[in-house]
Swiss-Prot record:
This is CRISPR-associated endoribonuclease Cas6. It comes from the Bacteria. CRISPR (clustered regularly interspaced short palindromic repeat) is an adaptive immune system that provides protection against mobile genetic elements (viruses, transposable elements and conjugative plasmids). CRISPR clusters contain sequences complementary to antecedent mobile elements (spacers) and target invading nucleic acids. CRISPR clusters are transcribed and processed into CRISPR RNA (crRNA). Processes pre-crRNA into individual crRNA units; accurate cleavage of pre-crRNA depends on a 3' stem-loop and the sequence of the bases in the stem. The mature crRNA is unusual for type III-A systems as it does not undergo 3' processing after Cas6 cleavage. Mature crRNA is about 71 nucleotides (nt long) with an 8 nt 5' handle and 28 nt repeat with a 10 nt stem-loop at the 3' end. InterPro entries: CRISPR-assoc_Cas6_C, CRISPR-assoc_prot_Cas6. Belongs to the CRISPR-associated protein Cas6/Cse3/CasE family.
Length: 314
């Protein structure tokens, strides 16, 4: 059955005509938008709210020591091999369940700490995924493994588990935005699919469309409103970037991707800016773009402090 178009709609965040309010009057006026009081129905926090308020986003970090030196650049490409380890470690019936879902409720990736040490981060987006995926890996019996492709053996030397309530999304959304500028680091190769083609560039519409789609699919199976997707392209500006192409091997295929950093500046009303901040918070767990479960699309977000306005001396 096709997913319903629902969730947060563009008209929930802003509407046409009228005079904008608040400290961003000029930017809102440029697009003819005005403030709407944030009493909207937030996807997953309306009639489904009681259940969703108990969900958590979790991140398990394993420090792994390896028995042979690894090039730092190579570590970020280990995702598919680590994904294989993950699938062999979790219950077989849950692996079958994962084959039936449109968006995987987890992401994972690895980053180098040194030539003989790496961090493997596994994030889950639901309580069930935490129990089925993180549970077995966080068990003391999971002490290490051997990567089949390279023969390199690993040993778990430390592990830590972070849990955040999904309701934090709503808290960020309803709060007044602290900033409208965000620096996003793309830690592992990132790419998007558009009209059957790979796009390996931090296009604002594709970045935030991806995050909104992942959020909607996980929370209640709904696609983001088309008008809202269009708003991502109109009201989020790529104000700085430093990226490089970085292909990602998945089996015999090579997926074109990019790594680096991009700075996004949000225009429009406060509600929209808060929504962008909430999506970025979620994205640090879900990953951004395609194949986040295979190790692509890992992001780290840094809110940038707004510039202080110079007040002329009397």
């Amino acid at each position: 059955m096709a997913a319903r178009r629902g969730g947060i709609r563009r008209t929930d965040l802003l509407r046409r005509s009228g005079q904008p309010r608040g400290r961003h009057r000029a930017s809102a006026a440029e697009s003819g938008l005005t403030w709407i009081s944030p009493t909207l129905i937030l996807v997953g926090f309306s009639h489904r709210g009681d259940r969703r308020m108990t969900e958590h986003l979790s991140r398990l970090t394993l420090t792994l020591e390896v028995d042979a030196p690894l090039e730092r650049a190579r570590v970020a490409t280990l995702g598919p091999h680590l994904h294989g380890v993950l699938m062999e470690s979790i219950p077989a019936d849950y692996v079958q369940t994962l084959h039936t879902v449109p968006v995987n409720p987890y992401s994972q990736y690895a980053l180098a700490r040194s030539t003989t040490s790496l961090e493997w981060k596994i994030s889950t987006l639901t309580n069930e995924a935490r129990q089925q995926i993180v549970g077995p890996i966080n068990d003391a019996a999971f002490a290490g493994f051997r990567l089949r492709a390279s023969g390199i053996a690993t040993q778990v030397t430390s592990r830590s588990l972070e849990q955040n309530p999904l309701s934090q999304f709503a808290r960020i959304f309803y709060a007044r935005p602290e900033t409208r500028k965000f620096r996003v680091e793309f830690l592992t190769p990132t790419a998007f699919k558009q009209s059957g083609e790979y796009v390996f560039w931090p296009d604002p519409r594709l970045v935030f469309q991806s995050l909104a789609q992942k959020y909607g699919a996980i929370v209640d199976g709904e696609e983001p409103d088309p008008g809202l997707i269009a708003e991502f392209g109109q009201s989020v500006r790529l104000s700085a970037f430093r990226v490089a192409s970085a292909p990602f091997a998945v089996g015999a295929a090579r997926v074109p991707g990019f790594t680096g950093s991009a700075t996004f500046t949000v225009r429009g009303v406060d509600t929209f800016a808060s929504y962008i901040a909430a999506l970025l918070w979620f994205g640090e767990f879900s990953g951004c773009g395609i194949k986040a479960s295979m190790g692509m699309g890992a992001i780290r977000v840094q809110p940038l402090a707004p510039r202080e306005k110079c007040v002329p001396k009397p």
